[in-house]
Amino acid sequence: MVPMDRLLQIVRRFEFLEARLSAGAAPAEIAALSREYAELKPVVAEIAAYRTALEDLAEAEAMLADPEMRALAEDELPRLRARIPEMEQALRLALLPRDAADARPAILEIRPGTGGEEAALFAGDLLRMYQRYAEAQGWRFELLDLAPSELGGIREATARIEGEGAFARLKYESGVHRVQRVPETEAQGRIHTSAATVAVLPEAEEVDIAIPAADIRIDTMRSSGAGGQHVNTTDSAVRITHLPTGIVVTSSEKSQHRNREIAMQVLRARLYDLERQRLAEARSADRKAQVGSGDRSERIRTYNFPQGRMTDHRINLTLYALPQIMAGDLAEVIAALTAHDQAARLAEMEA
């Protein structure tokens, strides 16, 4: 049974927010009020449906005392009683504490790991996979930085993805992605194993992370493309080093001013993510074992091209739909990861 007093508190809070927004809240408050209102709206809809189901059940049980209505009530009661546990479970999931970063845009970073040029090619495949997934969701996909490799792969890529639920859905992608396939350069037809690392970070605002000027060193350098060829004749590329943590961020677009903006944007996201991980570990020693822990060194997934198979090792999910997945069809994978994470958090909350 879900505590009714807690549900009523949520409804009252929602009604308060609705009244404030209708009355014309102060401009400085509108964004925060609107965000909270949007978060509570689906929860309040679940509460309304649950209360209606309880009322229908009570009405049917009362009908048992009426000889003329008893047969009808006996027909309806099994269905009505079966609905209550399902709706209570849906409510418990809706009431799970939300990750404050879920509504933010996502910063996506992809780097090849072991495997040389084949790893760089696979990193490029992953970048295209996420771009197609983002486009299918109607999200905005902005490539912030791209360093191509010799044979058309990538040495490093950074992108910003903005849209409803972008970080909430993509945050489970952080970790090591392993590929097993025959490289195009392999004359003997042997299967090679290589890997790429994916990091998905919530975008951070300046108000979230203050970076004193004394904490960073900014270096400029010559922009270069594939094979080390100079893209232009000015020192436009920017490398920013965060001295307290040693984090290094680079951006090599043609505009030095834009490169500074991009590098600071990515640096803020990384520092914000570090703080989020620190707080998560402080809240729960078991959090590392959950799907959304974001451990960058964890091998999370294998893409086996000869078998057309993708396996997510965290939840033992195997799908024989690799061409569709590489084309951006990640819906089933992300839904399974989300459900697993929700179940783990629900168990932790109720323990």
Curated annotation (Swiss-Prot):
<dbReference type="GO" id="GO:0016149">
    <property type="term" value="F:translation release factor activity, codon specific"/>
</dbReference>
<protein>
    <recommendedName>
        <fullName>Peptide chain release factor 1</fullName>
    </recommendedName>
</protein>
<comment type="function">
    <text>Peptide chain release factor 1 directs the termination of translation in response to the peptide chain termination codons UAG and UAA.</text>
</comment>
<keyword id="KW-0488">Methylation</keyword>
<dbReference type="InterPro" id="IPR050057">
    <property type="entry name" value="Prokaryotic/Mito_RF"/>
</dbReference>
<dbReference type="Pfam" id="PF03462">
    <property type="entry name" value="PCRF"/>
</dbReference>
<comment type="similarity">
    <text>Belongs to the prokaryotic/mitochondrial release factor family.</text>
</comment>
<dbReference type="GO" id="GO:0005737">
    <property type="term" value="C:cytoplasm"/>
</dbReference>
<dbReference type="Pfam" id="PF00472">
    <property type="entry name" value="RF-1"/>
</dbReference>
<dbReference type="InterPro" id="IPR045853">
    <property type="entry name" value="Pep_chain_release_fac_I_sf"/>
</dbReference>
<dbReference type="InterPro" id="IPR005139">
    <property type="entry name" value="PCRF"/>
</dbReference>
<dbReference type="InterPro" id="IPR004373">
    <property type="entry name" value="RF-1"/>
</dbReference>
<keyword id="KW-0963">Cytoplasm</keyword>
<dbReference type="InterPro" id="IPR000352">
    <property type="entry name" value="Pep_chain_release_fac_I"/>
</dbReference>
<feature type="modified residue" description="N5-methylglutamine">
    <location>
        <position position="229"/>
    </location>
</feature>
<keyword id="KW-0648">Protein biosynthesis</keyword>
